[in-house]
């Protein structure tokens, strides 16, 4: 049985995925787990760039998603991405963080996408 936190996380991943699909991206993989770390979403942009996406979903007030993805988390994401990329042809990559905050009154998601967080979010 899924926990409330797992349902919230899955909902956030669905919302984040739709954001990328609306921008013509293609889903390559989802919820990839290795002993060194996990990857929430892996998408290929129309430009060909493969994006490893970390999704952070919260209820209520805004939160600092940059603090939620610290150096340790980035290291785990990089290691997992390297494993996922093994044996695949070279492709440009980037790491994004999608912060989703659900409005406490309406339940509507507010979405902020931080692109290329490894090189300073844009």
UniProtKB/Swiss-Prot annotation:
This is UPF0102 protein cgR_1859. Pfam families: UPF0102 (PF02021). Disulfide bonds: none annotated. GO terms for molecular function: nucleic acid binding. Belongs to the UPF0102 family. It comes from Corynebacterium glutamicum (strain R).
